[in-house]
Amino acid sequence: MRKVKQNGSVTEQDYQPVLNVALKLLEIPEGYELNSVFGRKQNESDVWVFRYEKLNGENNGLNGEHYSFTVDNESHEILGVTWMDQRFASGQQLPSEKLTKELAQTFLNRTQPGLFDRLENHWIRPHDELITANGKKVIVTGMKYKCYLPEEDTWAWVIVGPEEKIITFEQRIKWEGGRLTEKWLHDIWLDMGNKIN
């Protein structure tokens, strides 16, 4: 196992309780291991950003393949998760709108009970992200179930990819003419100078 990158004076004791809660709700993909842990602010709250990368070192690093998630330090709620892997490259069969909704509901009921019933669905349609794998740009595509949460005036979404896998979930996203909430799970945003480390 490689050494986990951490920021500043962060120790495993600081983040392990939060990680333990998250690991009861999330399934780390086979072949991935914890690569880095950073404490950050998201919507002015303290969060942990966990990044898993491939154990074999293939396509690791910024803009590569990764499984990452953010967890609120106080409530231990999962605020977001993303799985960027070339296995979800565009051109594959995506779930129908009906199945996307069902899979989103199942995921949310497991990770954030009660949230699904409070959401107003605005649309369901394909969504693309860009990664680099084997030195080439790869478009990762899934069906995005985008919702609004009126009581918090925030947005949430679940993106379901090929093989009916959840490839992204985000909640408590503030939006006012554009996204205001930090994008700790988005390598393109990090690559623009919003560094994680």
What is each stretch, according to the model?
Residues 1-197:
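Long, terminal "pre-/pro-" and other extracytoplasmic accessory regions
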